[in-house]
């Protein structure tokens, strides 16, 4: 996996020659070092660790990522790595990761541009955990992925704020995602936010561009804690 200038080949020979050196340097500081080594145009490293106890057993889930420009699903120019120190069967692990990806890395946008390179690598190892505890592990993976994804969006090239789009009571999840992604990708919405202009028409317009059927009279719209529309009627 790699990111960088499109079209420039990776120096594979140099990488292979350094593998033995890197292996000899493995230690507890490696997590921090790796999170910094993968950065390109990023302004800050992105790493997150959670720890908990399940049935008396300490469980840790850790992750780090990079990404700043050319960020738009599916993942775009970003790298993300997750490790978990419990054993989980591959089929179950894959399904858990797929769920986490949909609500994290596949739900962010910086510039609406995709890329030729992206990778999400997740590894689990250790004693198998009982199935009854899998929902707790899923919650932990979701938390780590969302933290890293938001860190990428917050560190977007040229970004000075982070916008979170929340859609409630859509007909189904697919419709909700379409609306949220259309609003988050809209340059008109972004310029309104950048100019501190609560131009609610641009938000509704971006939602309407999706083709999802809804009635304006059913729409409540909040910008932050301030309600702008109630049942399609202007509140301010």
Please provide the spans of the model-predicted regions.
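Alpha/propeptide regions of enzymes that mature by internal proteolysis
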Residues: 1-236
